[in-house]
Amino acid sequence: MKARKLWSWSLALWVLACASVGAAPAAAEPFPVRGLCIAAPAPRQVERFAAWMTNELAARGVNTLIVRVDFNYAYESHPELRGGAPLSRAEVQRLVQAGRAAGIHLIPQINLLGHQSWQSTPGKLLQVYPEFDETPWVTLPAKYQWPNPDRLYCKSYCPLHPGVHKVVFALVDELCDAFEARAFHAGMDEVFYLGEDRCPRCGGKDKAELFAGEVTRIQQHLKSRQRELWIWGDRLLDGRTTGIGEWEASFNDTHRAIDLIPKDVVICDWHYERAHPTPIYFALKGFRVVACLWNRAEVGAQQVRDLMLMRERAAPAVRQRLLGVVQTVWSGVDGFWREWESLKNDPPPPPDQARVARCFLRVSEEWKVAEKSQSDEALPR
């Protein structure tokens, strides 16, 4: 029933998107964004990573690479926040040069607001600045399990702490300068701790307004430096109304922030279990959006086909906001490379193995089909 409601809701939005006077279906066009989101390489992997961008990713049509750096950079502004094996500025420059030569736009990421811990370990920011913790009374367990009485998934920093932005914005600026980046990805997914009652600064405040306030503050900071903000989109979807749930959408009322944040934020709309048709919702709200996938090849292929159809049928103003697709990788670089290389074996691994690399190969074939269809339609008859 929930699935039928979601499809009816999305179909109605889709029809609205297509309803322009005298509009005819547009010819298929290549996606403006054909991307991959992956962890930053370790210093020892930089040369291989640069060659991989040139020889493999560009050949597959990738033109956007979201690089999950977080604290794995040798920050000069806050050296106390360097990770264990940080990239140097020279190593980042090597990646930037390789990306530029391959026609790949690099977008660095630091998780802001949420994802400030993982299981039993605090993230670097809260290790060094525990006063930024939104929930200091929640102790990280020796052995993590979900569910748990504290509903602890990941810690958050308090968005109203007076000292937090001076620190994190220094990191953002330094990293963007090193990457010569036109855009920055702030994460902001799966934020479960926000506006907690016991927080002396934001307890009792509207969670949607808190989330929107943090998005807007980051966006305004980047805009003042001629950069744009990308974020994950799950906190902007109503998990109950849509039936999508509390992971790929929100159960803590942050979804209303969609009407409170600037429209020039780019939304990364991730769905991994099924191809929810939510990109059109974001596009109709005025946002540019990319559909994001993970480890189910058929789901990823369906997301590509759906987005192609949305772009083909939508009015021009909406079509230009449906930017494309991004394959996400949640292992380290080594893990993805192992999957990637295993698919070259004869015979290849069974279908239940190498699922992320298999999904990416399938999706990149799908967007090649889209480009071929567009080229064929352009031929004289």
Language-model-detected regions and their locations in the chain:
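N-terminal secretory signal peptides that target proteins for export/translocation
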Residues: M1-K5
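Intrinsically disordered and other compositionally biased segments
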Residues: L6-W9, G114
